[in-house]
């Protein structure tokens, strides 16, 4: 199955919901105010958020108000508006320095460690030498999981005893990367609730210690977001960004939700790059974000 097919399949819960609702909304062919209001409610219920949904409807009304339209025409117009909104997110990770330090964070249970493993596999496939740092020292299972990925992609693996200081492991990993001539350092951190200040401050400490090795590092700080959390993802990103400079996001579990509209809401609000999206457990279920493919998939086109 191609990535495009996987993406459409992964977004089917959201696209089916939107398509079924559009049939209900468009009992009339004319795009009048009542129909626009119903369409706006539909977008909000798909987790595009109030502000984003209103923006989309305003643009749609500007071109098509009181005109006769088909459902397919509306889908096509909506897709074009979404593509425009999502363009700021269309930025891949560029490996510009050596070692290029990538810090990955997120709340508990969002698929963070698996995502790091998949990133490592993709970087290795591109010929990069990798060092992986297990800074989630609170869970032996997380260390073990990352070690499996490191072995699989033949990466240098740096860890410490359970409950050891995560910042010191990050520091050691960058040291090791310089010694073994790694191109990339991938740093896994413990999942943390964004409303726990002490854990968020620990993340700030990791960043401060990393900067002792390289003032410009981390070169990327990625927040992994579980799409099934819907609008809660906005408060996650806001809070993490207060403590550390989030440079981009990766959105996982899009296949498990009818809330994939949150992707649009996040980009509209933060204008932040989406480095990748995930639609399943397998290695090739994570891929670079493409605004056009995503927008068309979201609308079942």
Give the label of every model feature segment:
Residues 50-52, 139, 255, 283:
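Short hydrophobic/aromatic residue motifs in ordered secondary structure
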Residues 1-19:
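N-terminal accessory targeting/assembly segments
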Residues 145, 165-180, 194-300:
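Conserved catalytic-core segment of NTP-binding enzymes
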Residues 17-135, 142-163, 168-187:
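Primarily NTPase-proximal linker/entry elements flanking Walker-type ATP/GTP-binding cores
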Residues 11, 47-49, 107, 136, ...:
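Residue-level signature of catalytic and energy-coupling elements of molecular machines
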Residues 12, 27, 44, 65, ...:
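Alpha-solenoid HEAT/Armadillo repeat architecture
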Residues 190-192:
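Short glycine-rich anion-binding loops that position phosphate/pyrophosphate groups of nucleotides
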